[in-house]
Amino acid sequence: MPDSMTNKTRSLLDRRGFLRHTSALLAAAGPATALVSTVMAAAAHGDAPVGATRAAESTFPRGAIYIPARAWNAYQMWEHYDPKIIRRDLGYAQSLRLNALRVWLSYEFWLADEAALRQRFSHFLQQCNAAGIKVMPVLFEGDGVEPTAANIRNTHPLTASDVLSPAGHIVMNPALWHGPLKYLEWFMEHFRNHRQLLAIEVQNEPWGAARHRFAEAMMRHAAKHRGVVRLSIGGANIHQSMAFIHAGADILQTHPDFPPSAAAVKHTLHRVLAMQRTLKKPIWLTEWQRIRTGESGWGHKQLTGTEWEPDYASMAPLIRSRPVGNFFWSLMLKPAWLLAQRRKGTLNGVFHEDGAVWSLADARAISGDMHFQATERKAWPHWARMIPESIGMPVTLRP
């Protein structure tokens, strides 16, 4: 899907809430539409069953998105995998009392070096085990630019980006799905029963009809090869996630990155809990960042004031107060993953590479530890300062 369409859809979802009916999103869902309508009605009227299932409410990951600070896409994370950096960053995750991480694998890196990906991901899981952290890997990606040779290795702060996986021409042509299917089978063969996996996310944000069909086929294939680890779909909203229940999704997701108010966050949490009970399936908030009272950042308008900076404290206490699995974006302080946000100056994350934090208030709100201590440094990483400089933003915020 073109960037402009993705941004338009995201903006609609951010401003109106993920539970509103949008025909553009439901058009691809087919038979799932009736299920969506039924569950929405039950949740809206408080008709969800009182008893919640063990599967829905017994496990609550409190996690983060993890991408090393200087990796601009998943390919780079695995190509430049550094065990020392991994151990250091997992220590930061432990200090926030996290028990889970959501990470992207890379079909394109698997094509380049299958053995290296297996060895590096296995090492990552070993280190997470030592840190007491579970992992939810993402196999395919629905956001970003095309995974050309230039794009996957681009490290320029103004132009480097997340990449689609697989490429658009593969997604559009089922005759070319043999490669992704083989990759999926490879992953399931080696990791479907791995005790360190919290879940297997088959596809993140399958925007557009073609990628929806691709993701549905991959989900069905994963279900045929499933082990003990549950399957998930990275729905940007609840509509998108529910369309994959019939294909085998065990865990649903929603991505309330930039809600407009605390009331909107509370509304989201209320509905998620009600729908978990109705569906008897977990629904996790797998991407959340901060409240933005002005623009969401997905449209064409600039952000309001300092709403470009991290502010997890605006959402964390509300989320921590509810029994809902969640992952904030992101553990490491990084320029925005997607160019639409980066061009507006969006900065994400908690930790600088040296262990300083952007905001002590954020670290304390996420961890629940009001005595958390670290150096607070509200300054862009030196290697990314050309981003704020290019749009006339401050590189450092003074107390």
How should these model regions be labeled?
Residues M1-G17, L26-A29, M40:
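N-terminal secretory signal peptides
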Residues R15-R16, R102, A223, E287:
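Short, cationic motifs built from Arg/Lys/His that form the positively charged side of catalytic pockets
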Residues T33-E57:
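C-terminal segment of N-terminal export signals and the immediately downstream linker at the start
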Residues R54-A249, L279, R322-G325, K334-A336, ...:
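Active-site mouth of glycoside hydrolases
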Residues L117-F121, A215-E216, K266-R271, G305-Y312:
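Charged helix-capping and loop-helix junction motifs
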Residues H212, V228-G297:
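Glycoside hydrolase catalytic-domain groove-lining segments
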